[in-house]
């Protein structure tokens, strides 16, 4: 006789249901906060497993990257084609303090800009900001008609395209290397750099739809908690205790 498990005897009663365990009981919610550079600081919420044993929830949250539409952060549909990446750098209670981690255009916006009868000009440059972030900036532009031009096409010569690219690189290096990452974010929202390039290239060939279409963070700067808290409108020197006044005197009892 073979020794083994008797399947007939081990069968349980029919109709018994397995205990349903809610997976969200082991998780907790955290609020994602954007820097004060943006008008709306409440980005959303994210989930993480609760701290158990040697596994700390904070370790799993730091370094998370979220992608948000700039229209949601600024409360304006004019920025609906721009995407911002935010990276979680610090956890305070149930709040996740983030910093800028990237910028990009939606693919449909880039495709809508490309049209016939015009030249496309692209340039990119790697720059270090004033606070030691290494970024790669991508710029895109298109030629347009001269004033009172009758000809339908607006194709630029290769020498003109090279001169425009040189101007693009010079302006991007100048505008980015002298500012911090937070100041650069403030320039990206109203497209200050794009207008500077358009103005500088006017003497070479008229341009239109000049945009910084992408910003990539290649290297993070050394983490500075004070700078991050200042970016979120908080102070690292706040004290919870109350200072005791110097007029305090010991009370001497006459009888013990």
From Swiss-Prot:
> Mind telling me which PROSITE patterns this protein's record contains?
RIBOSOMAL_S3AE
Q: Which GO terms describe its cellular component?
A: cytosolic small ribosomal subunit
GO MF, any single term: structural constituent of ribosome
Query: Any one Gene Ontology biological process term?
Result: translation
- Matching Pfam families: Ribosomal_S3Ae
Q: Where does it localize?
A: Cytoplasm
Listed A to Z, the keywords are: Acetylation, Cytoplasm, Ribonucleoprotein, Ribosomal protein
Question: What InterPro entries does the record tag this protein with?
Answer: Ribosomal_eS1, Ribosomal_eS1_CS, Ribosomal_eS1_euk
Cysteine disulfide partners in this protein: none
| Residue numbers carrying N-acetylalanine | 2
Q: Does the keyword Acetylation apply?
A: yes
Concerning its family, UniProt says: Belongs to the eukaryotic ribosomal protein eS1 family.
Query: Which HAMAP family does the entry link to?
Result: Ribosomal_eS1_euk (MF_03122)
Quaternary structure?
A: Component of the small ribosomal subunit. Mature ribosomes consist of a small (40S) and a large (60S) subunit. The 40S subunit contains about 33 different proteins and 1 molecule of RNA (18S). The 60S subunit contains about 49 different proteins and 3 molecules of RNA (25S, 5.8S and 5S).
Q: What is this protein called?
A: Small ribosomal subunit protein eS1
Q: Which organism is it from?
A: Komagataella phaffii (strain GS115 / ATCC 20864) (Yeast)
């Amino acid at each position: 006789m073979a020794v083994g498990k008797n399947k007939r005897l081990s069968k349980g009663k029919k109709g018994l249901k397995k205990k349903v365990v809610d997976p969200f009981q082991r998780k907790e919610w955290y609020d994602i906060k954007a820097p004060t550079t943006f008008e709306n600081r409440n980005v959303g919420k994210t989930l993480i497993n609760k701290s158990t044993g040697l596994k700390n929830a904070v370790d799993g949250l730091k370094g998370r990257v979220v992608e948000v539409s700039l229209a949601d952060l600024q409360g304006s549909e004019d920025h609906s084609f721009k995407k911002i990446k935010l990276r979680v750098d610090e956890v305070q209670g149930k709040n996740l303090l983030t910093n800028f981690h990237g910028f990009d255009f939606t693919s449909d916006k880039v495709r809508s800009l490309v049209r016939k009868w015009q030249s496309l000009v692209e340039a990119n440059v790697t720059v270090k900001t004033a606070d030691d972030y290494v970024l790669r900036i991508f710029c895109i532009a298109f030629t347009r008609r001269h004033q009172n031009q009758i000809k339908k096409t607006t194709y630029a010569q290769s020498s003109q395209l090279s001169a425009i690219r040189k101007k693009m690189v010079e302006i991007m290096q100048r505008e980015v290397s002298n500012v911090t990452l937070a100041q650069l974010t403030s320039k990206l929202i109203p497209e200050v750099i794009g207008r500077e390039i358009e103005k500088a290239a006017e003497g070479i060939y008229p341009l239109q739809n000049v945009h910084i279409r992408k910003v990539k963070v290649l290297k993070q700067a050394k983490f500075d908690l004070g700078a991050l808290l200042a970016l979120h409108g908080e102070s690292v020197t706040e004290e919870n205790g109350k200072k005791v006044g110097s007029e305090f005197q010991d009370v001497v009892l006459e009888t013990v």
